[in-house]
Amino acid sequence: MKISGVDIRPGNILEYEKGIWKVAKTQHTQPGKGGAFMQVEMKNLIDGRKTNVRFRSADTVERVRLDTKDFQFLYAEGDDLVFMDVETYDQITLPSDLLGDAAAFLQDGMTVLLEMYDERPISVQLPEQVEATIVEADAVVKGQTASSSYKPAILDNGVRVMVPPHIESGTRIVVDVYERSYVGKAN
């Protein structure tokens, strides 16, 4: 579907110069002289390159719709991750860098959403929140209980998050995968 250059929004997937790009940021600019334009920061979903492009209002670009499919994470094998299609039980192996930093939050049996373009995996979406166990938490400094201060803690997957002072080692908590932040105690 073709869209105008000024209708581009963050999160859009675009076909531009024979590549598939995900829009990271946009900034609409109306200079004093000349026409308005949209400054767009994009990342190539195939090779990971980043670029900044200026689209005028008269420019059109192809917006791509990605197919999405549920997959279940099975196991990690070196730098590769093995997933299974929950409908057909077919297995697929993907490089861990496709997930970026979020790969640390993968858990056995976790259902993820694979975004595909022409039957080719482009990105993996994890659930927004996951449960994890704290393996190491700093001691509470006396007198800090009145303020809303947080202390650093390390999770069982090696990720460091800030938690409230009352959270101790061994506690199961809920973590926001993309913000890497404490959400609450797990049930």
From Swiss-Prot:
What this chain does, per the entry, is described as: Involved in peptide bond synthesis. Stimulates efficient translation and peptide-bond synthesis on native or reconstituted 70S ribosomes in vitro. Probably functions indirectly by altering the affinity of the ribosome for aminoacyl-tRNA, thus increasing their reactivity as acceptors for peptidyl transferase.
What InterPro entries does the database record attribute to this sequence?
A: Elong-fact-P_C, NA-bd_OB-fold, Rib_uL2_dom2, Transl_elong_fac_P/YeiP, Transl_elong_KOW-like, Transl_elong_P/YeiP_cen, Transl_elong_P/YeiP_CS, Transl_elongation_fac_P
Entry GO terms, CC? cytoplasm
Know the name of this protein? Answer: Elongation factor P
**NCBIfam families found in the cross-reference section:** efp, PRK00529.1
Protein encoded by which gene: efp
Which Pfam families does the UniProt entry name for this protein? EFP, EFP_N, Elong-fact-P_C
Q: Which organism is it from?
A: Novosphingobium aromaticivorans (strain ATCC 700278 / DSM 12444 / CCUG 56034 / CIP 105152 / NBRC 16084 / F199)
Q: What family does the entry list? A: Belongs to the elongation factor P family.
